[in-house]
């Protein structure tokens, strides 16, 4: 069965209604955020959440020198062997965002780097493709000037410096975590790492594709998991619920903006809902909620047809993913934030920006305590742009991806999915809903909104690990 067509119709959340001030370059018309549509009452002034998912960067890789944040330009490496092994400091190298390196960031490399919480063995990770040692390559941080839009959002709005990804693994499971908070397929096993597919990961994968699992006793079972489609999971995936199930039950509108999947590609991530059989197999469900290309989010903001909940998965060239040699990710994020800020959606919206996994790069803060699902993983950055966050707020609260899921559930008074959302601290403490909605401040960027609206899709997978 081929991938279903992407979204044509658009549904709305309720809206609030004051125009934001300020003139962004390529400012969009203020969409009619009060247009009638399906709506479910919210617990906060927020009636729209946009979750932007960038790729493969630790917190320290992007914010090593951000004032007031828990970052560093010095790491630790383990040298020597046996009794001669010793921990020594190593200066992190400042690099370009468009660097060509793509490092190993699967579960085994996470365990090596973690080294029982000492965070000193990133230099012992080996490339997954060649088996050669990566050496000092993980010990880097990006030149702040090249991620200035991220720093501006953090300065004008809010940054979290202790958000840990759900598992110490790669993008396949990380994107599942961002729609449901975990990858448990039964009471003792969770998915981890990548499927063995030679095409897009999910229900479109070729027959015989396997996933990998980790047990609650932390036994890693490589290539012993089910086909990456929920109808092949234990109990036909009946317990593998996502936020989409909660939204549909409560009549909350949602869309997942992502590159269109292709049937002819190497094993790769395109869309987290390709794994979710009830969404993938239902033509009307897919066409209503899955929207391609990602720039459709800009169009929906302009047209006043933004749903209550949006996930935004970028084109590979706009994702910050190492190896694609592109510097466009920060501008892509800024273009969406600026579009919201120039529209009537601003006073009712929270834009949350996260990086899905650690990408194999150094980070100094050990996740603790470890759980029974191969996590928590290493720190990744989280930005929040909203009229209800104080300027230049840095949250040092320990969060996980379940914290974002929990905040989404709280916003629309939804029940818990029963994954990591249950034990995680909600990100609601980053907001001050008693303050008057702040006027929007434009985020300057190298590439304007018009660039992305005219950008030719790369046709590349968002991630292959």
Q: What is the meaning of each model-derived region?
A:
Residues 1-10:
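Bacterial N-terminal signal peptides that target proteins for export
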Residues 14-15, 222:
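Residue-level signal for mature regions of secreted extracellular proteins and peptides
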Residues 17-20:
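C-terminal motif of bacterial Sec signal peptides marking the signal peptidase cleavage site
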Residues 22-465:
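N-terminal pro-sequences and low-complexity stem/linker regions of secreted or lumenal proteins
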């Amino acid at each position: 069965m081929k991938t279903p067509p992407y979204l044509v119709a658009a549904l709305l959340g309720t809206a609030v209604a004051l125009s934001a001030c300020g003139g962004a370059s390529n400012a969009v018309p203020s969409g009619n955020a009060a247009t009638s549509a399906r709506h479910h009452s919210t617990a906060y002034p927020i009636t729209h959440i946009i979750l932007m998912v960038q790729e493969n960067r630790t917190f320290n890789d992007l914010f090593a020198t951000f004032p007031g944040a828990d970052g560093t330009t010095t790491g630790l490496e383990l040298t020597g062997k046996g009794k001669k092994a010793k921990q020594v400091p190593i200066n992190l190298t400042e690099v370009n965002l468009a660097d060509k390196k793509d490092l190993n960031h699967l579960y085994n490399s996470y365990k090596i780097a973690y080294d029982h919480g000492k965070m000193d063995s990133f230099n012992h990770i080996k490339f997954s493709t060649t088996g050669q040692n990566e050496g000092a390559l993980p010990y880097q941080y990006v030149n702040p000037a090249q991620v200035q839009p991220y720093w501006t959002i953090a300065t004008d709005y809010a940054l979290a410096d202790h958000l840990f990804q759900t598992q110490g693994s790669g993008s396949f499971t990380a994107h599942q975590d961002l729609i449901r908070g975990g990858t448990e397929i039964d009471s003792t096993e969770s998915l981890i790492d990548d499927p063995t597919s030679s095409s897009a990961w999910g229900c479109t994968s070729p027959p015989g594709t396997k996933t990998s699992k980790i047990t609650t006793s932390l036994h890693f079972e490589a290539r012993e998991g089910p086909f990456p489609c929920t109808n092949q999971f234990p109990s036909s995936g009946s317990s593998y619920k996502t936020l989409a199930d909660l939204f549909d039950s409560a009549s909350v509108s949602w869309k997942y903006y992502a590159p269109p999947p292709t049937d002819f590609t190497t094993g790769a991530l395109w869309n987290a809902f390709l794994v979710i059989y009830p969404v993938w197999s239902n033509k009307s469900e897919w066409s209503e909620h899955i929207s391609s290309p990602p720039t459709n989010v800009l169009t929906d903001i302009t047209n006043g047809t933004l749903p209550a909940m949006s996930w935004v998965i970028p084109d590979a060239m706009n994702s910050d993913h190492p190896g694609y040699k592109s510097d466009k990710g920060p501008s892509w994020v800024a273009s969406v934030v600026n579009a919201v800020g120039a529209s009537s959606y601003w006073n009712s919206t929270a834009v949350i920006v996260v990086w899905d996994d650690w990408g194999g790069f150094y980070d100094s803060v050990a996740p603790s305590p470890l759980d029974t699902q191969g996590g928590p993983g290493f720190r990744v950055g989280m930005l929040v742009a909203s009229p209800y966050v104080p300027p230049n707020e840095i949250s040092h609260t320990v969060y996980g991806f379940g914290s974002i899921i929990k905040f989404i559930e709280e916003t629309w008074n939804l029940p818990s999915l029963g994954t990591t959302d249950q034990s995680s601290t909600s990100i609601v403490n980053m907001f001050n809903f008693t303050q008057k909605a702040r006027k929007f401040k434009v985020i300057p960027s190298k590439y304007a909104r018009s660039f992305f609206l005219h950008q030719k899709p790369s046709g590349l997978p968002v991630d292959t690990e």
